[in-house]
């Protein structure tokens, strides 16, 4: 998703044709007047670049794929017209572009065309003919390179001469305009001569990973489909970007075809490693993106490809780590963050086959699934799942690390604590965010871990460095469902009365009990639920008060007395 200030012009496009195709001056002059050569309109500035410069209302960065997706939606909604006022100002982009909504749109199944640099015109010509057959007047597609997203808009305009065929290429790095070319029915076949050079100069191609034998994917979602399918296959299955695109898009059939058709044993070690690494020009692996996007079947097919490849074990393990951004993120952390439970299970099966061959500390780091922010502060993957309420993903993660246990007991405890850089535990965030189902799932894997009672109690307390405990936060917020869930996992933990009463003290900063804060906040339903937990555990208020200092213990007992009366 590079954001770059590259200044293309019609002159550069012409120069490409002169240098690469030896086109005559007369032909160039003819093209200039015919509008067959893609150009920017004088009505809008092509210098404006707001890609990766604006966040949406949730604070998430708006990048090229979100801008391209929004452009496609506007093009389709308005039969080929786009209001560039929505793209021309940061505040307008913030108001109109939602990262979560665009991510949903991007992940909808689609018709896929693999397109080499020299074949852009062939595919555009094919789609125009398909539009004619179906009496369509406009259609928009996503164009995806290995590290950038653009949009393609096609229109058929009625004219007295039988119709004009308009091509629009939207590049988010020229945020408030598009390239345009126009043909008519008499010269429609000339579209087939268009290549990537007619739309992007060399600097753009290099930045977008399209230099030399570049490959793009044209993604057509205009007709709903239950699963993605490939209309145009890549000419070369050994192209280093083929498996990357297949993993990213969930194109299982393509991975299976490579496994079935390509004689992997005939490849050199270097070619085989490059093919299976499936990385884009920024070093981002296709396996990471498959985990991020939840493509379980594709990951399974990739595992079978690895099995048949004969790749040495060390290299195979290296690929399965699925790291990106210089080790800042891993595929497992992305799967946990997005709640892809089945994907985690599939990945877990691949990992467990080779776990015995992975050096222990590397395996531990891999399973912790750290995400490192911009200043290299670490956040464990399980924390994301707890914070976001992904209950099934939490259970899948528990199955991965516990069935059978892949680490020693101490490291399992650290994984389950899921403490981020500031020592805040994941369960605390789940309790704070009201993620009742996630809390219940956490209780399930806690029991599965078969830890000693002291460690289990420590994890259930979920206390940060400031003395803030999980139950304190739930009582403070007054979330009844969360407190009920906590009561259930406390009950199934089978702690001693002393341990259970300590947790029910629900201490916060300065030793204040959560009950006191709940009473002050008039969270009476939460208090009623809390008292039900105390009764269910056969714990007396006096046993709980013993864990508080004299003043807070006295206040606690006074409130309990007043409520009962």
From Swiss-Prot:
Highest taxon listed in the record's lineage: Bacteria
Tagged with keyword Hydrolase: yes
Compartments it resides in: Secreted
GO biological process: proteolysis
Gene Ontology molecular functions: peptidase activity; toxin activity
Pfam family, one: Toxin_15
InterPro entries linked: Ankyrin_rpt-contain_sf, Toxin_15_N
Keywords, in A-Z order: Hydrolase, Plasmid, Protease, Secreted, Toxin, Virulence
Gene3D superfamilies: Ankyrin repeat-containing domain (1.25.40.20)
Location, primary (coarse class): secreted
Knockout consequences: Host cells display necroptosis.
Top enzyme category: hydrolase
EC number: 3.4.-.-
Gene Ontology cellular-component terms listed: extracellular region
Biological role: Effector protease that disrupts necroptosis in host cells by mediating proteolytic cleavage of host RIPK1 and RIPK3.
UniProt similarity note: Belongs to the Toxin_15 family.
Listed name of the protein: Effector protease OspD3
Natural source organism: Shigella flexneri
């Amino acid at each position: 998703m590079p954001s770059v200030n590259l200044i293309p012009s019609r002159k550069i496009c012409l120069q490409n044709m002169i240098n690469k195709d030896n086109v005559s001056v007369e032909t160039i002059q003819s093209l200039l007047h015919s509008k067959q050569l893609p150009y920017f309109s004088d009505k809008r500035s092509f210098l404006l670049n707001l890609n990766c410069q604006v966040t949406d209302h949730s604070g998430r960065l708006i990048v090229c794929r979100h801008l391209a997706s929004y452009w496609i939606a506007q093009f389709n909604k308005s039969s080929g017209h786009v209001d560039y006022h929505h793209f021309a100002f940061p505040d307008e982009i913030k108001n109109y572009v939602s990262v979560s909504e665009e991510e949903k749109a991007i992940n909808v199944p689609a018709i896929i065309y693999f397109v080499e640099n020299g074949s852009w015109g062939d595919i555009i010509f094919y789609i125009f003919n398909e539009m004619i057959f179906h009496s369509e007047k406009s259609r928009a597609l996503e164009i995806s390179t290995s590290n950038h997203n653009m949009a393609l808009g096609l229109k058929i305009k009625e004219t007295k001469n039988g119709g004009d065929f308009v091509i629009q290429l939207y590049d988010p790095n020229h945020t408030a305009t598009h390239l345009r070319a126009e043909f008519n029915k008499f010269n429609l076949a000339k579209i087939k001569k268009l290549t990537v050079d007619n739309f992007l100069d060399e600097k753009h191609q290099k930045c977008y990973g399209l230099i030399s034998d570049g490959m793009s994917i044209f993604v057509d979602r205009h007709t709903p489909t239950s699963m993605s399918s490939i209309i145009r296959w890549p000419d070369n299955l050994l192209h280093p970007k083929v498996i990357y695109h297949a993993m990213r898009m969930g194109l299982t059939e393509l991975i299976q075809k490579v496994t079935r058709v390509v004689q992997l044993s005939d490849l050199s070690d270097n070619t085989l490693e490059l093919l299976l690494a499936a990385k884009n020009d920024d070093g981002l692996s296709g396996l990471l993106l498959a985990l991020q996007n939840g493509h379980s079947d594709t990951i399974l097919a990739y595992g079978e490809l690895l099995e048949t490849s004969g790749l040495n074990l060390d290299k195979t393990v290296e690929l399965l780590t699925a790291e990106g951004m210089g080790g800042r993120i891993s595929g497992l952390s992305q799967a946990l963050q997005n709640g892809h439970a089945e994907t985690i299970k599939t990945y877990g099966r691949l990992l467990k086959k080779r776990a015995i061959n992975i050096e222990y500390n590397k395996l531990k780091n891999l399973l912790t699934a750290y995400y490192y922010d911009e200043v290299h502060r670490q956040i464990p993957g399980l924390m994301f799942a707890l914070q976001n309420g992904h209950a099934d993903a939490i259970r899948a993660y528990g199955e991965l690390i516990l069935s059978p246990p892949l680490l020693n007991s101490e490291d399992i405890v650290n994984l389950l604590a899921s403490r981020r850089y500031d020592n805040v535990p994941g369960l605390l965030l789940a309790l704070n965010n009201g993620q009742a189902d996630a809390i219940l799932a956490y209780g399930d894997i806690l029991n599965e871990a078969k830890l000693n009672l002291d460690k289990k109690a420590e994890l259930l307390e979920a206390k940060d460095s400031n003395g803030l405990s999980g139950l304190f936060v739930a009582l403070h917020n007054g979330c009844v469902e969360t407190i009920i869930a906590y009561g259930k996992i406390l009950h199934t933990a089978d702690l001693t009365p002393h341990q259970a009463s300590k947790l029910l003290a629900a201490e916060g900063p300065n030793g204040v009990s959560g009950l006191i804060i709940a009473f002050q906040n008039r969270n009476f339903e939460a208090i009623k639920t809390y008292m039900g937990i105390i009764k269910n555990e056969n714990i007396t208020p006096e046993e709980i008060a013993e864990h508080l200092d004299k003043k807070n213990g006295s206040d606690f007992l006074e409130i309990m007395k007043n409520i009962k009366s």
